[in-house]
């Protein structure tokens, strides 16, 4: 909404906003800040490091069906938002944020992965492992290439199916 108002786009759809962005005098600094704010918003939903602490605890304490739905489907909306909204609208800012995004993704993979290995509860291990796998998705987005984004989409599909079934398996094992 703010981007639509900022560039004075005639309609509220992404092609009009993108065309208005191309014709506007949006500075690189403003685009960098806007992309950063979008990255923070979507990163909180996906549980990007350092905004990751809520996710694993939430999955662990939620009923199994809620954990399956959130980890398998809803978490992917944040990645989809970065791939379909933030990066196409602000491609230069996406390239500028790329190194930091890959470092944050590496933090997701290494730090959360170590916490996942240390878990003694099966559902907790799956929860932290799910958060860790989002780091691989962010690495693919951070590469800023067709191959990186394609591999991210493939991992999103595979993760959605596998983590949902792992939560279901954890529920069966617990009972």
Region roles according to the model:
Residues 1-175:
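Hydrophobic transmembrane alpha-helices and their helix-loop junctions in integral membrane proteins
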């Amino acid at each position: 909404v703010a981007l639509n108002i900022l560039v004075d786009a005639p309609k509220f759809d992404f092609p009009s906003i993108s065309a208005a962005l191309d014709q506007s005098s949006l500075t690189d600094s403003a685009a960098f800040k806007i992309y950063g704010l979008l990255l923070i918003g979507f990163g909180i939903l996906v549980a990007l490091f350092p905004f990751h602490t809520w996710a694993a605890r939430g999955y662990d304490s939620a009923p199994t069906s809620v954990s399956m739905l959130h980890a398998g489907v809803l978490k992917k909306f944040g990645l989809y938002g970065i791939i379909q909204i933030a990066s196409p609208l602000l491609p230069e800012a996406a390239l500028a944020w790329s190194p930091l995004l890959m470092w944050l993704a590496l933090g997701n993979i290494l730090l959360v992965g170590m916490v996942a290995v240390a878990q003694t509860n099966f559902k907790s291990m799956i929860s932290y492992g799910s958060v860790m796998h989002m780091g691989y998705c962010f690495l693919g987005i951070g590469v800023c290439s067709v191959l990186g984004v394609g591999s991210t989409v493939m991992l999103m599909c595979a993760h959605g199916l596998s983590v949902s079934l792992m939560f279901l398996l954890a529920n069966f094992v617990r009972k």
